[in-house]
Amino acid sequence: MVIKGMRVGKYELGRTLGEGNSAKVKFAIDTLTGESFAIKIIEKSCITRLNVSFQIKREIRTLKVLKHPNIVRLHEVLASKTKIYMVLECVTGGDLFDRIVSKGKLSETQGRKMFQQLIDGVSYCHNKGVFHRDLKLENVLLDAKGHIKITDFGLSALSQHYREDGLLHTTCGSPNYVAPEVLANEGYDGAASDIWSCGVILYVILTGCLPFDDANLAVICRKIFKGDPPIPRWISLGAKTMIKRMLDPNPVTRVTIAGIKAHDWFKHDYTPSNYDDDDDVYLIQEDVFMMKEYEEEKSPDSPTIINAFQLIGMSSFLDLSGFFETEKLSERQIRFTSNSLAKDLLENIETIFTEMGFCLQKKHAKLKAIKEESTQKRQCGLSVTAEVFEISPSLNVVELRKSHGDSSLYKQLYERLLNELGSSSQVQELLA
């Protein structure tokens, strides 16, 4: 455990600035220069346990090539036997999420200024062949002067990760900010999906609320596929047009970065960011990722990739456990995804219920199943409801709810449904 006053190389560690599932960030001082930094401390054992070495390496490699005033800088990476230390630019103004929650929406003038900086940073990334894939308010920090700094590139992709069809194929991001083509689990253009996320951020900046939101994840996804969020009357026509063009559900007709920069609303009082893009020498130790060979050889297509439904990411701001498959089997309500067609999925669920001896009541995409059992010692059984929510033709959510009954039987039922009908990557992750 790191204690206050401990040193890592020339850095003296101080208070904790933030903490996530697999890392914590501490304030640090360079004892030679007095300069302030933020050091992200990652336990190697945690990397091994969660199989996220690929993502952390990707974050480091991505930050190495980015040098822009609106992007958090990586200064160096150090390692001990048990930890990795990423020495980052210290940004003291908190994140945009906290700013909106505490003070509400921004004026259109303030919001446009921040949005211009966001687009400058994202445009720079895209020109470098880097696509963030997890842009959200929590990943936009504010410095002491109110300038934005984009952070958390753990889900980012470089242009060489595109397949032969020229598209990315890994579902990444946070549900409220994810583009419809990403949720559809098909190939997508990284630049277009980032633009969608920027559109969501612009909407929140100017309205103080999310464009696509609901307590039910399936409903959120339906709203995203439909697009066309309600825009308050106080939003100017120029801003309204910009939002609608960025939140176009069709990635082909969605506005590009060039189109955004050419828009009159964006150009108003716009001053492009100045930056020096000369190459720097980064101190990246060769032994930072010395792990067992099988860890290094893990395929990027394995469940180590974090997506919108398997979020084990570096941030604690978003926890999907209340929505999705990380819920404990003992809990009354469990959800998982399936790539089967909704009609086939419902028929297969009905078959499994029947084979396990349940009596069924069926209504639309909802099944109520009851099983009564008696033993010498007690009367037992199980009453459950299963419902299918269609998010897209190739992606459905199954929700299983226990009304009452035997927890062990409920677990058997859930595990069979998941094994036979769930997405294969989820089966490996959940039943490990």
Swiss-Prot record:
Record-annotated membrane-spanning stretches: none
Domain Protein kinase: 11-266
Chain intervals for the UniProt region annotation (Activation loop): 152-181
Domain of life: Eukaryota
Annotated positions of the Phosphothreonine modification: 170
Subunit structure: Interacts with CBL1.
Name this protein carries in UniProt: CBL-interacting serine/threonine-protein kinase 17
Organism of this sequence: Arabidopsis thaliana
Lineage: Eukaryota, Viridiplantae, Streptophyta, Embryophyta, Tracheophyta
